[in-house]
Design a protein with these regions (language model features):
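A conserved ligand/cofactor-binding region detector
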Residues: 1-547
Length: 547
């Protein structure tokens, strides 16, 4: 057996109470069943309400408890000694969502196997490794103490004890430095008493890693700086990756055949061998076959989108693709400003249409249920697409598609067809990214910032195959420290001002200015992720793409 995937669903132990039903209380008769099924009905339930937060914590604990118990009871041989666990298993904590596993493991060892606290803790902290997948503070889970005390009182007791012992260790290591002790405490006192799950994971793990070289450095220098100073040997980097079996061999069989015909078999299991293709970069036959593969993949995605969504893509366009979850730091808004600028320049006559490469921009994204600004951005992209695609003045030069319900199945069709991969997050905010890897693996060029795994991709593919733009992470920090005023960039760049004014005028929303006020207001008066600051550099990079 190579690996085991466990899929859990919650079921009530008593799903139907006939006595209560017969008394006429029909809802109460199935309450236990409904409550249990809700736990696993929707992965990551929306948590902007107290009820949503409670359900999400219940779900996290349910998955964690089921997985730990399954491993200990069914995977380990009968009669094994739990003291051997560190020699047999490492539980990987992927982000903060499963970190409740730490007190659950302690509960199992202390309450079910009757180990002494110190022995149980010694075992537990050798059984976990923590991967942090973010640099956004809001993405590092923090659970109210009051909620944990109500739902998982025993686990909260255990967390208190872990924190008590940890703080004692800190005071011994840093005598008199109470400010540091408060910063590092697993339990925060402000703005409300809460458990910092990233701190708990770091304290309990034998290794802590980021998911790209830059991300791991920022993790040590900023997000978990105090911890990296205390335990420098605990921190490492493991850059994210993608499986070539799915994202080239399965999704792009034509390119797979071309590569195999060129350098032989075995490269799927050893991607370093792709470097052998360098010798064929100027080979006319190889280049012609590569162009034919890309053209065939464009035909395939055109057929899929027409059948799936009624979207008819123009032929012979540069396929410019931005597919990823919708978040402000990923800056779909910056891509939208580029589209509006191209549109404005075409309809105003500022540029000769013949001088522009025909371009189709494809978006794919979903927003978290409670993420208002992300939903506003999706709305605006679709409105811009509707106007652009029906304006005869830009026909044959610019087209925008936003197929709904982007998923892995659709990704396997879009990615092989892409000419240009948009990886334009604000420098210092993208932990790694994996879409950037999938596009590069399928022969797309990248336009992107010096962020996440972009840094390592650019080192491998070379500057000629990567259109770099934007501020570096230190430059971002410097601008924010000086005080960022997006209005200054708006007033100082005529193209940017025209693009924003065109959106704000209601041009894309049938004259309804209120429909775009949230997005425009945020760009002009907040712009947390500096889209306006990077706009000029981004347009210059897009002009290099055209060249």
């Amino acid at each position: 057996r190579v690996n085991t995937l466990r899929l859990w669903s919650a079921k009530a132990t008593n799903s139907f109470d006939l006595r209560v039903f017969n008394s006429g209380d029909y809802e109460e008769a199935v309450r236990a069943q409904t409550f249990a099924e809700n736990i696993s009905k929707v992965l990551y339930p929306e948590d902007s309400t107290p009820q949503g937060k409670e359900l999400r914590l219940q779900q996290q604990y349910f998955f964690v408890a089921a997985s730990l118990k399954d491993f200990i009871r069914h995977t380990m041989p009968k009669g094994f000694d739990v003291r051997e666990l560190p020699e047999r298993i490492i539980f990987q904590l992927n982000d903060t969502h499963p970190v409740i596993a730490v007190p659950e493991m302690m509960r199992i060892l202390v309450d079910e196997y009757d180990l002494e606290w110190d022995e149980a803790w010694g075992i537990t902290k050798q059984c976990f490794a923590y991967t942090c997948h973010t640099l956004l503070p809001e993405a590092l889970e923090v659970w109210p103490v009051s909620l944990l005390e109500r739902l998982l009182p025993r686990h909260m007791e255990i967390i208190y004890r872990i924190n008590e012992d940890f703080l004692a260790e800190l005071r011994e290591t840093y005598p008199g430095d109470e400010l540091r002790v408060r910063r590092m405490s697993i339990i925060a006192d402000h703005p409300e008493r809460s458990v910092r799950m990233a701190h708990l994971a770091t304290v309990a793990s034998v290794k802590v890693n980021g998911v790209a070289a830059l991300h791991s450095e920022l993790l040590k220098d900023k997000v978990l700086n105090d911890f990296s100073e205390l335990w420098p040997e605990r921190f490492t980097n493991v850059t994210n990756g993608v499986t070539p079996r799915r994202f080239i061999r399965q999704s792009n069989p034509e390119l797979t055949k071309l590569i195999t015909d060129t350098i032989g078999k075995g490269w799927v299991a050893n991607l370093d061998r792709l470097e052998e293709l360098t010798a064929y970069a100027d080979d006319p036959e190889f280049r012609e076959r590569f162009r034919a593969v890309k053209a065939a993949n464009k035909v395939r995605i055109s057929e899929v989108l027409e059948q799936r969504n009624g979207i008819v893509l123009p032929k012979d366009h540069l396929l410019d693709v931005m597919v990823k979850r919708l978040h402000e730091y990923k800056r779909q808004s910056l891509k939208l400003l580029h589209i509006v600028t191209l549109y404005d320049r075409l309809i105003s006559g500022e540029v000769d249409p013949a001088s522009l490469t025909p371009r189709t921009v494809v978006f794919g994204a979903k927003a978290a249920p409670g993420y208002h600004m992300a939903k506003e951005t999706i709305f605006l992209i679709n409105r811009v697409a509707s106007v652009v695609n029906n304006d005869p003045r830009v026909a044959g030069k610019l087209f925008v598609a936003f197929p709904p319900n982007y998923n892995v199945t659709l990704a396997e069709k879009i990615i092989p067809a892409a000419d240009l991969s948009e990886q334009i997050s604000l420098a210092g905010k993208e932990a790694s990214g994996t879409g950037n890897m999938k596009f590069a693996l399928n022969g797309a060029l990248t336009i992107g910032t010096d962020d996440g795994a972009n840094v390592e991709i650019r080192e491998l593919v070379g500057d000629d195959n990567f259109f770099l733009f934007g501020m570096t992470e230190p430059e971002v920090a410097e601008l924010q420290a000086r005080g960022y005023h997006p209005g200054e960039f708006y007033e100082g760049n005529p193209s940017l001002k025209r693009a924003i004014d065109l959106i704000a005028s209601g041009h894309f929303t049938e004259g309804n200015r209120d429909a775009v006020s949230a997005v425009i207001g945020d760009l002009l008066y907040n712009d947390r992720f500096l889209a306006l600051a990077d706009y000029a550099s981004y347009l210059e990079a897009q002009e290099r793409v055209e060249a």
